[in-house]
């Protein structure tokens, strides 16, 4: 079984837009980077789609997604949408020697991090979601989490009840 991105981490984003990738996520990124041999590891940051966060995939996971997109008939609306939002609006990222990345301008725009917020310092939340992780502006993530739980579960309900629909 492949390694998974698990957990939730709040990380400072400095004035130069540098942010440290959580150490447990770095291990999964390394395991999913076929070219990694002890130096710098890489992953793919996707900023496409109608959402307020970016999604990050290991190189291996992104290759699987690309194969699935390639299997769709050329020129179909589904394929064009996926190509645009998963391939065109994506960047290869490389961790520096300290395990950091510079959040690219398009990623900062997607997260809603303004230049003024960078100057004053801001925080990003990294959320593991099995085969990928998300990067959110911390305050937006907290608000989204609260709203999502309110919609999906009544107070005191067992969250595993959501799996009943899958038959697992």
UniProtKB/Swiss-Prot annotation:
Q: Where in the cell is it found?
A: Cytoplasm, Nucleoid
> InterPro entries per the record?
MraZ (IPR003444), MraZ_C (IPR035644), MraZ_dom (IPR020603), MraZ_N (IPR035642), MraZ_sf (IPR038619), SpoVT-AbrB_dom (IPR007159), SpoVT-AbrB_sf (IPR037914)
Task: Quote the protein name from its UniProt record.
Answer: Transcriptional regulator MraZ
Coding gene? mraZ
Quaternary structure, per UniProt, is: Forms oligomers.
A GO BP term, please?
Answer: negative regulation of DNA-templated transcription initiation
Q: What is its main location?
A: cytoplasm
Give every SpoVT-AbrB domain span. Answer: 8-51, 90-140
One Pfam family named in its UniProt record: MraZ
């Amino acid at each position: 079984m492949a390694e998974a991105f698990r957990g939730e981490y709040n990380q400072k984003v400095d004035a130069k837009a540098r942010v440290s990738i959580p150490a447990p996520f770095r291990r999964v990124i390394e395991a999913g980077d076929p070219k990694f041999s002890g130096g710098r590891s890489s992953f793919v940051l996707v900023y496409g789609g109608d959402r307020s966060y970016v999604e990050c995939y290991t190189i291996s996971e992104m290759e699987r997604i690309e194969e699935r997109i390639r299997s769709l008939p050329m020129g179909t609306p589904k394929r064009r949408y996926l190509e645009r939002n998963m391939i065109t609006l994506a960047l290869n990222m490389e961790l520096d020697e300290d395990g950091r990345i510079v959040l690219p301008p398009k990623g900062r725009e997607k997260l809603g991090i303004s230049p003024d917020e960078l100057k004053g310092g801001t925080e990003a939340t990294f959320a593991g979601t099995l085969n990928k992780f998300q990067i959110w502006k911390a305050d937006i993530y907290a608000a989204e989490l609260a709203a999502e739980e309110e919609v999906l579960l009544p107070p005191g309900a067992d969250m595993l009840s959501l799996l009943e629909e899958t038959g697992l």
